[in-house]
Regions:
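Generic amphipathic alpha-helical segments used as scaffolds and interaction surfaces in large
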Residues: 10, 24-31, 79-82, 96-100, ...
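Short acidic (Asp/Glu) and glycine-rich catalytic loops that position anionic groups and cofactors
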Residues: 19-20, 88-92, 141-145, 161
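Iron-sulfur-cluster electron-transfer modules
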Residues: 74, 82, 107-110, 114-186
Length: 186
């Protein structure tokens, strides 16, 4: 091959490489490869407070709602966590309730919330429990944090469950089995 042919071939290969690279970058948000930027973003913005910490409710008498009962109450950080899920199932495989045959599946909770978010269900009137997440699965969680430890995106599943349980307990008076008796005996 002559020098001119090699230079032309190099140019064509270089242009083809550029076009393929740009097509890949454009396809990232619509494919599984989106985890390349969603997971690091979720890890960067993870909360620095201890896991399982129940936050004090300031001005409790003036609060309109407690916890999260509607999708519109989730903040940007919660929605980022839903979007960062790579659907690997590690959270479910280490969940002691799931392993014992209980109703809790952390992966399904996050995926159902992610699905609602992607469908545009950000309306404040949509009730999460029992429409999106079952009450039994929320109340079955032991808040051990094994799911968060195993999650490659560091999604704070326990915090999400705690927020929804707070709404069940403080707004609707629904507790896990045995808790109501304990509270009555105090």
């Amino acid at each position: 091959m002559s020098k001119e042919q090699l230079e032309a071939q190099h140019l064509y290969i270089w242009i083809l490489h550029g076009v393929i690279s740009l097509m890949f970058v454009a396809a990232i948000p619509m494919t599984y490869f989106a985890h390349m930027y969603k997971s690091p973003t979720s890890i960067y913005w993870q909360r620095t407070k201890p896991r399982g910490l129940v936050e004090k409710i300031d001005n409790i008498e003036e609060q309109e709602s407690f916890g999260i009962s509607k999708f519109g109450q989730f903040n940007w950080h919660d929605r980022l966590n839903f979007d960062a899920c790579v659907e690997c199932g590690r959270c479910t495989s280490v969940c002691p309730v799931n392993r014992a045959g209980g109703p809790l599946d952390p992966r399904e909770i996050i995926l159902s919330l992610k699905k609602r978010m992607m469908e545009g269900y950000t309306k404040t009137e949509e009730v999460l429990v029992p429409d999106v997440v079952s009450k039994e699965s929320l109340l079955a969680c032991t808040t051990c944090g094994a799911c968060v430890e195993q999650c490659p995106s560091r999604i704070e599943i326990v915090t999400t469950i705690q927020q929804m349980r707070c709404s069940l307990a403080l707004e609707e008076g629904q507790f896990a089995e045995g808790v109501a008796k304990t509270l009555q005996n105090i």
